[in-house]
């Protein structure tokens, strides 16, 4: 009996390590937060690309925070109207990556990123993608997804800080330069993600 109890106790100790190490099993950085629809019914607050890049303070999140829950501003929904400058529909995680600027003639690196997850995660995302497709229909799209002529769009969705692209830890002021064409400031890591609705202004 003592041997059996000892074996059970040992098994518990051995299993505790892997379970603790496997608490974060998301397939991509903060994936549950990126596809979540629980905030979709909140009333959106107005925002702009200029305000996001100039006034939204970055949270203390970095690449190591792979499963960090939403907090602070990320618990709010925002509506942004801007000009679609680039659309990338071929991302590893299946999201559509869209770059939005304040004006049609704004520098392309003054963009914010908004992302629409795949239809399989919610019909909302399918509708948002369909509306975006209708907005860019007939536009010339260059290699890499850049639109020859920008198109105006309204975007509604949850704020999200993509700390995966932060260079140097949770308090760094630089990104790794891999966040699309948007500038390398940490504030440019703020996204609207997921996008719940796309509208024609």
Q: Where do the model's predicted regions map?
A:
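Aromatic-residue detector
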Residues: 1-2, 97
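Bacterial N-terminal signal peptides
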Residues: 2-16
